[in-house]
Amino acid sequence: MRHAAVAAALSALALVSPAAGQDAKPAPPPPPLQVREIGSLHVGGRVATVEGLPAREITFSPGAPPTRIDPNGQFPVEQMYAQYVKLQEPRARYPLLLWHGGGLTGVTWETTPDGRPGWQMFFLRAGHDVYVGDAMERGRSGWARFPEILPGEPVFRTMGEGWGLFRIGEQSGWNPDPARRVAFPEARFPVAHWDQFMKQGVPRWTTTDRQIQAAYDALVQTVCPCVVVVHSQGGNFGFTAALNAPDKIRALVAIEPSGAPPQAAEAARVKGIPHLVVWGDRIASDPFWTRVRQNIERWQDQIRAAGGGAETLDLPAEGIRGNSHMLMMDANSDEVASRVQRWMESKGLMRD
């Protein structure tokens, strides 16, 4: 009965075509989740020492006396944060870890810009315990002084940069005035809520991959065995985490990953870990994304040559058009998640 209820909930989450749903009554809301525990943790990191900086006085609150601040001393740095939700009766054999992309945080997985439940809720309803992480330097993980501790300086994404990069529309279709923006005609991203999406953006560094990887590896050692779902910049961190701990990761799902391990990486180490890579629309017509995909396919070929399994879910090849780089936020996000869920079921990752 419990399995039937889960199947019914997943069916309710799947999108129907507008034509099919015009005269249909709204689906009843799914039953409440039976949650055992909600919590969080920080993992990884080190203690850094800052020396030689001048002290100064700062007033922290209006009307309060100034406080003398000495910026020299020891600081915890390079840690990462993760929040978890554990179910009363999970169907999945292992917890599911959701890792975000560049310039973003775990908010990616929580709620879509137009207010729909995100993949965190989808996979909870599918029966997974879910961990949502903020990479080192992002969100609730925090960042450190720069350049004294973090090398380089942060990069900030403008509101318009992602319009073309994330394949919402041509870059020339971006305009600060929402009424003048032009998206692709088949776009599934909720374009009317682009400004809401951009509020998720946070500073990022291009010089901290080693530290980010170390924190993700610490998370894997703390909470796994597990299944990892990664997006964009998170792709290479997930691939590398599997290389670093092949005994801990049971499967890896990469949603439009933007990077992969180098040619010299030992793909045989992950031959026992099933891999799935998911691609949205308009990859072939975009030179940047064409090169990205070629690099990922090179890594998939290496895994297969080593005797492992590396599959691809090409949504346009399946007749699903219009998906952007932000698949988990597109109008058919539940449909895509359902396909990922079925793949995990086919790999024996759910209890019978």
What do the predicted segments below correspond to?
Residues V229-G238, A242:
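Gly/Ala-rich beta-loop-alpha elbow adjacent to hydrolase catalytic centers
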Residues E110-V130:
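Short amphipathic alpha-helix adjacent to the substrate-entry channel of hydrolases
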Residues A24-R91:
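N-terminal cap/lid segment of alpha/beta-hydrolase-fold proteins
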Residues H100-T112:
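Active-site glycine-rich loops that stabilize anionic/oxyanionic intermediates
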Residues I320-G322, M326-D352:
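Catalytic active-site module of serine/aspartate enzymes centered on a nucleophile-bearing elbow/loop
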Residues A92-G102:
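Short beta-strand element of the alpha/beta-hydrolase
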